[in-house]
Structure formats: C-alpha cells, structure tokens
C-alpha cells in the first residue's frame, strides 16, 4: 500500500511536468474536496495541471472522487436515461440549446436526467434559464427523482449535488481561466447516467473525454465540438464527434445535411440574458412566429436528435433527428417545460413551508 499522494507532493510532480496516476489524482482531489488544502494550493494545482495538460488517468481519478462525494439521485433504472450537457466556455453566448433540447427529448418519450449550473462565462446557464421559466431548482435528490419518474425530465442543480465544490469556488473565480473543473461537471451527473451528449469547448478534448467515460462505465456517449467553436452540434458548420458505443470510441465529422437539416448561419441565435433565451426557446418550441424561432427550432432538433440516438431511442443520428422534429412540432416539448415548472412548484411549497 503506497502512502497517499498529498497536494504538496502533487505540486512538486506537476511543476516538473510529471503525470499523476489515477489513484494519486484521487488522493489529491479528495484532499481538495474535503477542505484540507489552502486556496493558494488549489489555485496552483489547477494552474499547474492546465499547463501540463490533464491526462486521461488524471481526469478519471478526479471524476471518481467527485462522483463519490456527490448527492446522488437514485433512479429505478438507468436504461435509456440520457443527459445532454456542455462544458460551456465556447464564448458564443447562443441560447440554451441543450436545455431546450432536453424538453424535446422528453416529449419524444425518452427519460432525461439533466445536470447543469448557472452561467460561468456565458450570459445564461441552464439553471438561469430554468429559473426564468419558473422551474424551482432547490430540490432534494428524492424530489429530482420524482420529477424524472413523473414528468420524464428532472434537473439536477450542480451546486446542490456537488457541495464539496465550494472549496474550489474562490480559486476558480480568481484564476478566471478554464481549469480541470470545467471538464468535470459534465462527467459527474448525480444520477449516474450512462447515455449522454457532452459538448466540449475544444475539439482536442473529444476523444479523451470519451475514453474517460468508457473507463467509468458509460454505454453510449457522443462528445462533440463544432468546427465553428460551439460545445454542441452546429447548424452552421460540421461538428466533430467522438462516439463511445459497444466499448469502442470512433471519431467522425457530421454536417446538418447528413441528418436532413439545412445548414444556416447562427445569426440571431445569440442572447444577452436568460429572459431573452427563454423567449427564443418558447417561440421555437411553440408557434415559431419569428425567423429566429424557426432557426432555433432546427438547432434544437439537431441536438435533441443526437441525444435520442445516444439514449438508444433511435438507431442512427438521422432517425433521432426525425423523431426530435416530430416531438417538437407536436407542441409537446413546450408542454413539458410548463409541466416541469408546475411539478416543481409543489416541492417549492413543501421545502419553504
């Protein structure tokens, strides 16, 4: 039994460009997440890791500890339960595509356990958007599970489930850089989903994160980054995909046209606030009275369709997109959004009583 790695030894390693093993990284992360390190040590470690560049082993070690310390959501089954999530940090300030897509996925009859947070770098995070839509966020894990069982979709507010993250908040904010933690959120779904779309801020992360999820037991995952820099499937450019399926990772590019959708510019899809994002999404999921609403609907269908494929609810990306198109155009997705708001309002009364 080797002695556990501590943060001082880890800093010494990292500053010399030496990698940590999965176990060593887990030791250091446990020290950080249980409040045993100073903010200076945490900041130095995150910066050193970023400059050295995190290995698959190190990310696996970090994710394992975060999953272990998370407030878990226990579901009856994880078969076909999907999450659609991005690292954020793509700098595009586009409306909340993955959150809007989640309601289309649920409308198509697939179960969604959505993990998300407030905006870090963008104008509107998934939590900000849902709050604007009247969804109550401060749920217990049991209440989230009830949402998922009854509505077919539930939202896990990252800060409620990953309370150990509070130790890193100061250093992360003060560094103002993307760090290891930007990658960890999408990999630490509190329900333990094994089907996922993960959007990343850099194409170079696609394959490594697919490999990390393979090591951690995921079944069918698409890790994506578009050529125009988005952490999701783009309407305006090809998207690079690292797909984990049947225990193997394959890489390919996909164009909107391959999936039966016409490419178009992203003009009109950027938002300045959660309220503006919500207005665009309500139009896209509703009557599509504006040109931007129609375009947003296409972008949502593209991403929701990919998630239906990752959930094995469809046998191909193209079939997933066709199913998502039908689910959006029935108006059911808009109803799901209102239904989740109404369902969580009951818990709000209970929790605040």
Curated annotation (Swiss-Prot):
EC number: 2.4.2.18
Binding site for Mg(2+) 1: 98, 232
Details of cofactor binding: Binds 2 magnesium ions per monomer.
Recorded GO CC terms: cytosol
Cofactor(s) listed: Mg(2+)
Keyword terms: Amino-acid biosynthesis, Aromatic amino acid biosynthesis, Glycosyltransferase, Magnesium, Metal-binding, Transferase, Tryptophan biosynthesis
The keyword Amino-acid biosynthesis belongs to this UniProt entry's keyword annotation: yes
Any one GO MF annotation of this record: magnesium ion binding
GO biological process: L-tryptophan biosynthetic process
Pathway involvement of the protein, from the record: Amino-acid biosynthesis; L-tryptophan biosynthesis; L-tryptophan from chorismate: step 2/5
Top-level taxonomic group: Bacteria
The reaction(s) this protein catalyses: N-(5-phospho-beta-D-ribosyl)anthranilate + diphosphate = 5-phospho-alpha-D-ribose 1-diphosphate + anthranilate
Chain residues that bind anthranilate 1: 86, 117
Assembly description: Homodimer.
Family from the record: Belongs to the anthranilate phosphoribosyltransferase family.
Function: Catalyzes the transfer of the phosphoribosyl group of 5-phosphorylribose-1-pyrophosphate (PRPP) to anthranilate to yield N-(5'-phosphoribosyl)-anthranilate (PRA).
Protein name: Anthranilate phosphoribosyltransferase
Native source species: Pseudomonas syringae pv. syringae (strain B728a)
């Amino acid at each position: 039994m080797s002695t556990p790695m501590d943060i001082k030894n880890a800093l010494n390693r990292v500053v010399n460009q030496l990698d940590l093993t999965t176990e060593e990284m887990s030791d250091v992360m446990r020290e950080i997440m249980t409040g045993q390190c100073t903010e200076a040590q945490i900041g130095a470690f995150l910066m050193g890791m970023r400059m050295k560049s995190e290995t698959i082993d190190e990310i696996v070690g970090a994710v394992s500890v975060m999953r272990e310390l998370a407030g878990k959501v226990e579901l009856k089954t994880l078969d076909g339960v999907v999450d659609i999530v991005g690292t954020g940090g793509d700098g595009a300030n586009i409306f909340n595509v993955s959150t809007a897509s989640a309601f289309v996925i649920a409308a198509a009859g697939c179960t969604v356990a959505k993990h998300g947070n407030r905006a870090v770098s963008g104008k509107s995070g998934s939590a900000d958007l849902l709050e604007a839509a009247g969804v109550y966020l401060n749920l217990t894990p049991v209440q989230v599970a009830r949402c998922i069982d009854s509505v077919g979709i539930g939202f896990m507010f990252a800060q409620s489930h990953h309370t150990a993250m509070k130790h890193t908040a100061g250093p992360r904010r003060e560094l103002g850089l993307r760090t290891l933690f930007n990658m960890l959120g999408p990999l630490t779904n509190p329900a333990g989903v094994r089907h996922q779309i993960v959007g990343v801020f850099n194409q170079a992360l696609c394959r490594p994160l697919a490999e990390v999820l393979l090591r951690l037991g995921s079944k069918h995952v698409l890790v994506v980054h578009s050529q125009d820099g988005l952490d999701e499937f783009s309407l305006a450019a090809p998207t690079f995909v690292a797909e984990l399926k049947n225990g193997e990772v394959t890489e390919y590019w996909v164009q909107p046209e391959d999936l039966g959708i016409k490419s178009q510019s992203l003009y009109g899809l950027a938002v300045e606030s959660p309220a503006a994002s919500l207005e665009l999404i309500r139009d896209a999921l509703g009557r599509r009275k504006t040109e931007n609403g129609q375009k947003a609907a296409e972008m949502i269908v593209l991403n929701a369709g990919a998630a239906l494929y990752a959930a094995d609810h469809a046998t191909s990306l193209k079939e997933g997109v066709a199913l998502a198109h039908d689910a959006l155009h029935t108006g059911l997705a808009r109803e799901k959004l209102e239904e989740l708001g109404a369902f969580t309002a009951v818990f709000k009364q209970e929790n605040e009583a």
